[in-house]
């Protein structure tokens, strides 16, 4: 037996023994997510990475799993105990499939922890909202359930995605999220910390984007913060991002240099082609960019994970022997609970719950009424219930009418003058003289250039498969070939094909339709959409036959906004808004059910309907959960984990990542919104009373009483928000610091205890580069949402008094308090392996608050002027103390020390570095 196989030894010692037995080539074979086998040591081939956003994900119908609600829906439950149960299910089902295929399935990718400061992000459904405390609590519970409670072994190892500031899709492989140390530590990092320090996450995936100029997989804080402070196990790159460092980020000229930067900054495993990684490793070694010790550190980190999974320990690891099943009745029951708990009642004038009399009819109308869509990170459920069928199972088929509300169109070719018809094999030909059943298509128009045509004759989507054919069961693949991009052209329509490169749909000489390179629109490229049926009018006619309408609108999670594509706006598709107007005029008793991956701007819609119920694409139990909620058998209590804005006009540019300076998210934005963070209604009412506080070691204990003053049992999500009233720096207007979902029977009272841990109140002190608890006055507000505050009290809490900046020590420019200037920002220096401040040729200013000036007569400024000469002026408040001219430099990172003579000044004032011209500043230090 090899020493590394001795289960009586500490795992770290066993890993070191294994490394001692490996050859250099064998170690290099373990640097990618496809870890090569080492037969002589009985080490199997191993794959890192199985998706787990909504439970175990296999897109193979032969591998069914329990499909949870979308993560943004799970977050809306505000129920960590439920998250833990869901994590256990995901972990157990991963173990089940790992026993069938032992080389994979246990190193999981998920949950997605990126804070969602902008609802237009294409992957909003994957995240847990905009608040880092909520994200941390919910994902800590989910990952703990996946990992298990054993002190030595892990059921699975979840990897948090995507560290960090990954909240846009456009140009994600090359763009830079411009962030500051405060926004990183207080917002973007903080969201990840909970699942690592207090949860079960032992791995992390670096994001595609850059962080103020440095690719996220080379961020030095992967080592300094994630590993050294949080003690995370290992870090992987996102898919193909290792090679993208050269090909897209252009961070380095060679893959060897990129690998060296990744390894030295804490990234251990490259999610990339193993041959490319191997070649880069040998090149880096030959050039002296890395040592074998660098490889040992990375390989040891990921191999420690494999040891913790019990790969080498047989029955000594309890997770190798515990029962593991998939899609069990217990799993289904927990999943139904999750689907019901994430039902969020946004608006209700009293029509809900529905009070149906015997024989009354319900019309389910709308494009989401008979669908149960999957997004990309979704497994295959063994069953699925849509909203129409959920109601029919409870009310009877004859009592539930249905219409999808889609327009029916025919597509006429300008070239042939004929209509597109569906042949027996599904191929489309522009050859029909008249419109019959084979020429009719349901027009699924999702707006923003995303349309599908659904053939009425065979219930198949039109897809591009060489020629265009009506043969697709559903739009579901990485590339959506059913995607048509309509564009008006005079009185005709042009269709772009699904490809990201410009391609047109054009009629060929044989009458078939093909995708051809984009060119000037000729007759072959022009079509007319001829209306056959007006879907809104048809739906309105059906609505008149019903006593109540359940109008189901929302998004298709594989189109418009998803991975690779951000949402251009917050509006519902135009066809759906037309449908709402027609149906509610036909029947005022219209309940709007929004089935969506993200929030919409529903301001005008809310004025038109008596109730709005929101659900995410909630998995197999969607229809059951909606039906139970509409009928009053489930009392909704979910809360919005992300703000619903009135329109996109209320949002800054999607690339604005500095939430503090830009007043982004509910933390800093005090403007009017549609539904605030934490909003959610109930079928009953609750009263709050008796808020008290008691200081404890490590935090503050709050107690209050919640009374159910209505006639229905229900859950209430009690939320506690904090505000620092006397802080040295700009702090949030409100920040969630504790919450609890409690069940309160009608007419009864429930005591609620909330503990606010100190870490929830800390902020990042840029003067000393650490998170601190600041001494001072704090307001604590308890309520049903961030805007519905019921009780409040103030406390003086112990902590640190933030000292004045010590100008006698180096002051890094990145640690400014405020800045001004059109392009004043931070960038990253590979030479310094740190960030620096820079301006464009219009100049700018960096301000360092409350600096201690002690009659200094000189300063040393490390700066560069990468174009023409620039000038840096040093101020104490409004008083200029001195200036220095920076001569032209070789590059923005060509820092040199420049001596500045100063007028003596004593006292505490803001240090201002006013820059005239294009310049870079790394640090400044004052002296005699």
Q: Where do the protein language model's features map onto the residues?
A:
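Residues embedded in well-ordered secondary-structure elements
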Residues: 451-453, 494, 677, 695, ...
């Amino acid at each position: 037996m090899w020493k590394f196989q001795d289960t009586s030894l500490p795992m770290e010692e066993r890993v070191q023994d294994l490394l001692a037995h490996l050859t250099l080539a064998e170690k290099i074979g373990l640097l990618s997510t496809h870890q090569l086998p080492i037969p002589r040591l009985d080490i199997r081939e191993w794959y890192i990475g199985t998706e787990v956003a909504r439970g175990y994900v296999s897109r193979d119908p032969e591998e069914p799993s329990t499909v949870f609600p979308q993560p943004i829906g799970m977050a809306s439950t505000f129920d960590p105990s439920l998250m833990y149960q869901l994590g256990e299910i995901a972990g157990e089902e991963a173990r089940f499939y790992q026993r069938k295929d032992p080389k994979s399935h246990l190193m999981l990718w998920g949950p997605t922890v990126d804070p969602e400061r902008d609802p237009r992000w294409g992957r909003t459904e994957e995240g847990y909202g905009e608040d880092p405390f909520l994200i941390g609590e919910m994902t800590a519970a989910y990952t703990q359930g996946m990992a298990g409670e054993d002190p030595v072994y892990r059921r699975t190892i979840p990897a948090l995605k995507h560290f960090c500031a990954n909240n846009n899709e456009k140009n994600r492989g090359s763009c830079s999220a411009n962030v500051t140390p405060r926004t990183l530590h207080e917002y973007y990092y903080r969201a990840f910390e909970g699942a690592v320090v207090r949860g079960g996450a032992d791995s992390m995936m670096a994001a595609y984007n850059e962080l103020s100029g440095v690719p996220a997989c080379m961020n030095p804080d992967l080592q300094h913060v994630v590993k050294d402070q949080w003690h995370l196990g290992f870090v992987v790159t996102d898919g193909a991002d290792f090679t993208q460092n050269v090909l897209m980020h252009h961070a380095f000229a060679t893959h060897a240099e990129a690998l060296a930067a990744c390894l030295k900054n804490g990234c251990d495993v490259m999610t990339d082609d193993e041959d490319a990684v191997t070649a880069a490793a040998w090149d880096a070694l030959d050039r002296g960019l890395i040592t074998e010790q660098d490889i040992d550190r990375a390989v040891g980190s990921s191999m420690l994970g494999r040891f913790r999974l019990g790969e080498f320990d047989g029955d000594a690891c309890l997770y190798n022997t515990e029962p593991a099943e998939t899609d069990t009745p217990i799993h289904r029951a927990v999943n139904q609970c999750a689907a019901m708990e994430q039902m969020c009642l946004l608006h209700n004038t009293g029509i809900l719950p529905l009070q149906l009399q015997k024989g009354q009819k319900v019309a389910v109308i709308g494009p989401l009424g008979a669908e149960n869509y999957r997004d990309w990170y979704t497994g295959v459920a063994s069953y699925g219930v849509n909203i129409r069928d959920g109601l029919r199972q409870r009310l009877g088929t004859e009592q539930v009418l249905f219409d999808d509300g889609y327009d029916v169109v025919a597509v006429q070719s300008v070239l042939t003058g004929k209509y597109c018809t569906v042949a027996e094999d599904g191929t489309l030909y522009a050859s029909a003289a008249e419109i019959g059943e084979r020429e009719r298509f349901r027009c699924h128009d999702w707006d923003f250039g995303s349309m599908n045509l659904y053939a009425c004759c065979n219930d198949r989507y039109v897809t591009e498969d060489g020629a265009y054919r009506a043969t697709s069961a559903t739009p579901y693949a990485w590339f959506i070939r059913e995607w048509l991009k309509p564009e008006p052209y005079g009185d005709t329509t042009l269709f772009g094909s699904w490809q990201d490169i410009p391609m047109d749909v054009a009629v060929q000489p044989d009458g078939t339709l093909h995708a051809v390179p984009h060119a000037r629109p000729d007759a072959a490229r022009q079509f007319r959409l001829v209306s056959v049926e007006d879907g809104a009018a048809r739906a309105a006619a059906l609505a008149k036959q019903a006593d109540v309408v359940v109008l189901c609108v929302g998004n298709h999670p594989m189109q418009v906004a998803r991975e690779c594509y951000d949402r251009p706006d917050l509006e519902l598709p135009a066809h759906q808004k037309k449908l709402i107007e027609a149906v509610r005029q036909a029947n005022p008793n219209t309940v709007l059910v929004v089935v969506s991956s993200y929030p919409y701007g529903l301001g005008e819609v809310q004025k038109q309907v008596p109730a709005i119920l929101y659900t995410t694409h909630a998995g197999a139990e969607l229809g059951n959960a909606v039906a139970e909620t509409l009928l009053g058998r489930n009392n909704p209590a979910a809360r919005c984990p992300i703000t619903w804005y009135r329109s996109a006009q209320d949002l800054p540019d999607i690339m604005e990542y500095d939430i503090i300076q830009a007043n982004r998210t509910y933390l800093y934005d005090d403007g009017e919104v549609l539904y605030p963070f934490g909003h959610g209604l109930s079928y009953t009412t609750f009263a709050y009373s008796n808020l008290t506080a008691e200081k404890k070691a490590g935090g503050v204990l709050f107690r209050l009483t919640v009374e159910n003053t209505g006639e229905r049992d229900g859950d209430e999500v009690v939320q506690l928000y904090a505000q620092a009233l006397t802080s040295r720096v700009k702090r949030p207007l409100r920040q969630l610091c504790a919450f609890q979902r409690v069940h309160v029977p009608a007419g009864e009272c429930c005591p609620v205890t909330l503990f606010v841990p100190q870490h929830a109140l800390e902020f990042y002190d840029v003067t000393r580069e650490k998170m601190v608890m600041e001494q001072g006055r704090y307001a604590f507000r308890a309520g049903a949402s961030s805007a519905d505050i019921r009780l409040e009290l103030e406390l003086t809490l112990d902590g640190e008094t933030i000292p004045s900046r010590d100008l006698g020590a180096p002051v890094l420019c990145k640690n400014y308090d405020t800045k001004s200037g059109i392009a004043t920002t931070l960038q990253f220096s590979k030479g310094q392996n740190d960030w620096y401040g820079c301006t464009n040729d219009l100049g700018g200013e960096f301000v360092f608050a409350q600096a201690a000036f002690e009659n200094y007569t000189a300063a040393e400024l490390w700066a560069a002027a990468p174009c023409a000469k620039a000038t840096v002026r040093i101020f104490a408040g409004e008083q200029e103390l001195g200036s220095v001219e920076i001569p032209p430099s070789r590059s923005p990172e060509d820092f040199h020390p420049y001596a500045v003579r100063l007028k003596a000044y004593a006292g505490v004032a803001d240090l201002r570095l006013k820059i005239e011209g294009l310049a870079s500043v790394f640090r400044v230090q004052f002296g005699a």
